[in-house]
Amino acid sequence: MLKEFKEFALKGNMVDLAIGVIIGGAFGGLVNSIVNDIIMPIIGLITGGIDFSNMFIQLAGEPRATLAAAREAGATIAYGNFVTLLINFLIIAWVLFLVVKGMNRMKKKEEAKPEPEAPREEVLLTEIRDLLAKQKA
């Protein structure tokens, strides 16, 4: 049973998947930092100093100054957080699109490679076979 598990776990696809998940998690953290620490502050500066992480609509209770206070008081729609996550998603989707596009281009190049010429001996043997077939006919 241990041998079967070892064969299953060490198959190429399983290891590739595990590596992909680990790299994907690290990439997600990197994109999250880029969005939160670089892109959103620039967008905030362009839009007049708006802090998107604190943008919300309070649905119940008295108006609150911060998102945390509004959530404690009742229902809120945190659309600033949604905008941040949407930008995060779009960046990840764009990078994945580029990766898939690059992989497809590499596959097409591999498929487009011409078949190697048959060895000269094989060509001669084919010609001899064809001549013998004509003589019999």
Curated annotation (Swiss-Prot):
GO molecular function, one term: mechanosensitive monoatomic ion channel activity
Alphabetical keyword list: Cell inner membrane, Cell membrane, Ion channel, Ion transport, Membrane, Transmembrane, Transmembrane helix, Transport
Intracellular or extracellular location(s): Cell inner membrane
Superkingdom of the organism of origin: Bacteria
Main location group: membrane
Chain ranges passing through the membrane: 15-35, 38-58, 80-100
SUPFAM superfamilies associated with the record: Gated mechanosensitive channel
Pfam families with a match to the protein in the record: MscL (PF01741)
Topology versus the membrane: Multi-pass membrane protein
General function of this protein: Channel that opens in response to stretch forces in the membrane lipid bilayer. May participate in the regulation of osmotic pressure changes within the cell.
Family listed: Belongs to the MscL family.
Protein name: Large-conductance mechanosensitive channel
Organism per entry: Brucella anthropi (strain ATCC 49188 / DSM 6882 / CCUG 24695 / JCM 21032 / LMG 3331 / NBRC 15819 / NCTC 12168 / Alc 37) (Ochrobactrum anthropi)
Gene designation per UniProt: mscL
